Amino acid sequence: MGGPRGAGWVAAGLLLGAGACYCIYRLTRGRRRGDRELGIRSSKSAGALEEGTSEGQLCGRSARPQTGGTWESQWSKTSQPEDLTDGSYDDVLNAEQLQKLLYLLESTEDPVIIERALITLGNNAAFSVNQAIIRELGGIPIVANKINHSNQSIKEKALNALNNLSVNVENQIKIKIYISQVCEDVFSGPLNSAVQLAGLTLLTNMTVTNDHQHMLHSYITDLFQVLLTGNGNTKVQVLKLLLNLSENPAMTEGLLRAQVDSSFLSLYDSHVAKEILLRVLTLFQNIKNCLKIEGHLAVQPTFTEGSLFFLLHGEECAQKIRALVDHHDAEVKEKVVTIIPKI
């Protein structure tokens, strides 16, 4: 390398390196305040039912256009983890700062710095302008590489950052190559863990539109297994994902072929939490609606015993749904009234 151009590249490299060193200083300075910040200021639970849940998710019809919907964000303006590059939660990094942060994330092996950098990137990815900038800077594979990390907290923070980045449809094109890996982590990792919830939330975001839903075909039975064994938060998050799939007629046969334990029908009992009960009722309704679209009717002999088809079309399921017409909650009763004619 020689001449003015070579000198310019050297100067640019030194400037970027200096900026990254400053990022390291700002991030590591947070250690002196104590690592407790990372634990206390946790991201919003991925499984918690939000107030004002989209009507489309609970009423058997889509409240979203074909290309958009209700996205699952891991950071809200009211409950953001601390942005450790500055003291303010509301500051938005510019493109140059984001580039330095991505360089730092890619070059450091310090787990504390990695985690803090991922939190900062995740916070900034909550803003639409930065979702595009991070993609254009090549940041998506840098963040996604951290879902391979052995540190579970780092893996979770990487998934959370991808959750916010996935709100951008163009970003999904780059994120989709990691769907299989995320599925493997979700179904092989600890039940009800933060990593599992973060992974389920990312899969939910990636299935808001129909574009990438087919990539989950081979994992549908696993989803139902997690649904039946997980806690309340996990159940709600799995159901959000299943509802996305159930609105797409192209996924109906795959859902009905899934092998599902008969304990699934217990989710239609009257004592089940409302946020779960409404969603399993909507799942039933969506599948029934899809079966009728353009004469797309299922033929019973094509489904094996033990499949979701046999559970939903059996008399036990019909009896449980009819019994809910006397449910104490008005929303549940209203939902049941609309479903009974379809039984």
Swiss-Prot record:
Q: Does the keyword Acetylation apply?
A: no
For the region Disordered, what residue ranges are annotated? Answer: 43-83
Q: Where are the ARM repeats?
A: 138-180
Q: GO MF terms on file?
A: DNA binding domain binding; p53 binding
- UniProt keyword annotation of Endoplasmic reticulum present: yes
Pfam families (UniProt xref) = Arm_2
| One Gene Ontology cellular component annotation held by this UniProt entry | mitochondrion
**Gene3D superfamilies membership:** Leucine-rich Repeat Variant
Phosphoserine, modified sites: S45
The UniProt entry's coiled-coil ranges are none
TM segment ranges: 5-27
The set of disulfide-linked cysteines is none
What superkingdom heads the lineage? Answer: Eukaryota
Where is there biased composition of kind Polar residues?
64-82
Q: Which residues carry this modification: Phosphothreonine?
A: T85
Q: Which GO terms describe its biological process?
A: negative regulation of apoptotic process; negative regulation of intrinsic apoptotic signaling pathway by p53 class mediator; positive regulation of growth rate
- Which InterPro entries does the entry mention? ARM-like, ARM-rpt_dom, ARM-type_fold, Armcx_regulator
Expressed, tissue-wise, as follows: Expressed in all tissues tested with higher expression in placenta, liver, kidney, heart and brain.
Which compartment or compartments is the protein found in? Endoplasmic reticulum membrane
Q: Which UniProt keywords apply?
A: Endoplasmic reticulum, Growth regulation, Membrane, Mitochondrion, Mitochondrion outer membrane, Phosphoprotein, Transmembrane, Transmembrane helix
Its job: May play a role in cell survival and cell growth. May suppress the transcriptional activity of p53/TP53.
Alphabetical list of PANTHER family matching this protein: ARMADILLO REPEAT CONTAINING PROTEIN (PTHR15712), ARMADILLO REPEAT-CONTAINING PROTEIN 10 (PTHR15712:SF19)
Relay the record's extra comment: Depletion of isoform 2 results in cell apoptosis while its overexpression in cells leads to accelerated growth rate and tumorogenicity.
Q: How does it assemble?
A: Interacts with the DNA-binding domain of p53/TP53.
Q: Could you tell me what this protein is called?
A: Armadillo repeat-containing protein 10
Q: Which organism is it from?
A: Homo sapiens
Record gene name: ARMC10
